[in-house]
Amino acid sequence: MEGSKTSSSTMQVSFVCQRCSQPLKLDTSFKILDRVTIQELTAPLLATAQLKPGETQEEEANSGEEPFIETRQDGVSRRFIPPARMMSTESANSFTLIGEASDGGTMENLSRRLKVTGDLFDIMSGQTDVDHPLCEECTDTLLDQLDTQLNVTENECQNYKRCLEILEQMNEDDSEQLGLELKELALEEERLIQELEDVEKNRKIVAENLEKVQAEAERLDQEEAQYQREYSEFKRQQLELDDELKSVENQMRYAQMQLDKLKKTNVFNATFHIWHSGQFGTINNFRLGRLPSVPVEWNEINAAWGQTVLLLHALANKMGLKFQRYRLVPYGNHSYLESLTDKSKELPLYCSGGLRFFWDNKFDHAMVAFLDCVQQFKEEVEKGETRFCLPYRMDVEKGKIEDTGGSGGSYSIKTQFNSEEQWTKALKFMLTNLKWGLAWVSSQFYNK
């Protein structure tokens, strides 16, 4: 409630408001308190608070002669309470007045004054429900509240007075009637109390049922939350499975499209592309033959022969044809024919050129043997298709191919004692016959 601040040789004491805690500056009158002022400040609100028990009874007896005094026209009864200063001045709350010290306010006088002021505020706080000291604003607020309470109390007093007047006007009959009504009301009260007890019992039962229902509702909420989590998980899995299903369906559609495309694709035509490049017949862009003006590398010629052997071997397997006298062995650019009469005899369909090429006739024998296999393929096709005819007739014994539709000349498939131009043309005619055979096999076995 009080604080202190030390500065050099003096001490300034300040108090704070007990409501807003703001620092207060005390009025100068606190420095010159006399005995009467102190008694007025410390006196209780009611005079009976200072009386002894015997004196209180005597006061009450004396006051019974004139309990109410009409002082205003508003009908409010008031009792006169003598002020505390009219009572004995020798009370426990008396103070010893402190004057100014001769030395201008020593620390001892300041401490005594602080103690007197603090005790004064404590006594004032003990006499009422309000703690002291208060600032001016809080005091105004407190006064407003007290005025409001006073108005409410005055209104209550007026209401009590009106009720008293009504009671005084009632006669004895009304009293008897009121007694009967009172008994009826007492019975009604007992009945209502019984109903209240029944309602209370029902309330307890309902409260127990409510607790059970709330527990069940909480359990259902937990189950609902669990079901919601499971539903969300299943929904996520469903979405993932839907995505996978759509992906699989797209893959199936793509695979079906590729399958339909493959079904429509001629495997032989796609694998073996026979065409021509100038005077050369080509298979898969490999030229078969050579000219003085265009010396094709033997590696390319050997690769073309490898593709040609592979084509005839595939056509024969498709038809189920077994060649007589020779067996085709596709082996890339080192393909050859194997003699069935002499297993150790191999006829190579590849050559490296050089001087050995002119004296070694195995390459020529291999090309004639291959022409024999083409002739066997033609004869096998003619057994089932009499109208089938190749554009160039082949003479296996001489190893030549005749240009029946053109000049009518014959061209040897051998290299010895033959020009490169005629050899290249014979190979071109042979590839043309194979192209016709490939087209026939594709037409016959396309849907098989």
Swiss-Prot record:
Region of interest called Interaction with BCL2, as start-end residue ranges on this chain: 110-157
Residue span of motif BH3: 106-125
GO cellular component terms given for this protein: autophagosome; endoplasmic reticulum membrane; endosome membrane; Golgi apparatus; mitochondrial membrane; nucleus; phagophore assembly site; phosphatidylinositol 3-kinase complex, class III
Cross-linked sites for Glycyl lysine isopeptide (Lys-Gly) (interchain with G-Cter in ubiquitin): 400, 435
Ranges where the record places region Required for membrane-association: 423-448
Record's comment on post-translational modification: Phosphorylation at Thr-117 by DAPK1 reduces its interaction with BCL2 and BCL2L1 and promotes induction of autophagy. In response to autophagic stimuli, phosphorylated at serine residues by AMPK in an ATG14-dependent manner, and this phosphorylation is critical for maximally efficient autophagy. Polyubiquitinated by NEDD4, both with 'Lys-11'- and 'Lys-63'-linkages. 'Lys-11'-linked polyubiquitination leads to degradation and is enhanced when the stabilizing interaction partner VPS34 is depleted. Deubiquitinated by USP10 and USP13, leading to stabilize the PIK3C3/VPS34-containing complexes. Polyubiquitinated at Lys-400 with 'Lys-48'-linkages. 'Lys-48'-linked polyubiquitination of Lys-400 leads to degradation. Deubiquitinated by ATXN3, leading to stabilization.
Residue ranges the record marks as coiled coil: 140-267
Gene3D superfamilies: 6.10.250.3110, Autophagy protein 6/Beclin 1 (1.10.418.40)
Annotated membrane topology: Peripheral membrane protein
Phosphoserine modifications at: 14, 29, 88, 91, 94
Any one GO MF annotation of this record: protein-macromolecule adaptor activity
Subcellular location: Cytoplasm; Golgi apparatus, trans-Golgi network membrane; Endosome membrane; Endoplasmic reticulum membrane
Keywords assigned: Acetylation, Antiviral defense, Apoptosis, Autophagy, Cell cycle, Cell division, Coiled coil, Cytoplasm, Cytoplasmic vesicle, Endoplasmic reticulum, Endosome, Golgi apparatus, Isopeptide bond, Membrane, Mitochondrion, Nucleus, Phosphoprotein, Ubl conjugation
Region feature (Evolutionary conserved domain (ECD)): 243-448
PANTHER family reported in the protein's UniProt record: BECLIN 1 (PTHR12768), BECLIN-1 (PTHR12768:SF6)
Subunit relationships: A homodimeric form is proposed to exist; this metastable form readily transits to ATG14- or UVRAG-containing complexes with BECN1:UVRAG being more stable than BECN1:ATG14. Component of the PI3K (PI3KC3/PI3K-III/class III phosphatidylinositol 3-kinase) complex the core of which is composed of the catalytic subunit PIK3C3, the regulatory subunit PIK3R4 and BECN1 associating with additional regulatory/auxiliary subunits to form alternative complex forms.
Leftover remarks: Expanded poly-Gln tracts inhibit ATXN3-BECN1 interaction, decrease BECN1 levels and impair starvation-induced autophagy.
Role this protein plays: Plays a central role in autophagy. Acts as a core subunit of the PI3K complex that mediates formation of phosphatidylinositol 3-phosphate; different complex forms are believed to play a role in multiple membrane trafficking pathways: PI3KC3-C1 is involved in initiation of autophagosomes and PI3KC3-C2 in maturation of autophagosomes and endocytosis. Involved in regulation of degradative endocytic trafficking and required for the abscission step in cytokinesis, probably in the context of PI3KC3-C2. Essential for the formation of PI3KC3-C2 but not PI3KC3-C1 PI3K complex forms. Beclin-1-C 35 kDa localized to mitochondria can promote apoptosis; it induces the mitochondrial translocation of BAX and the release of proapoptotic factors.
Record's protein name: Beclin-1
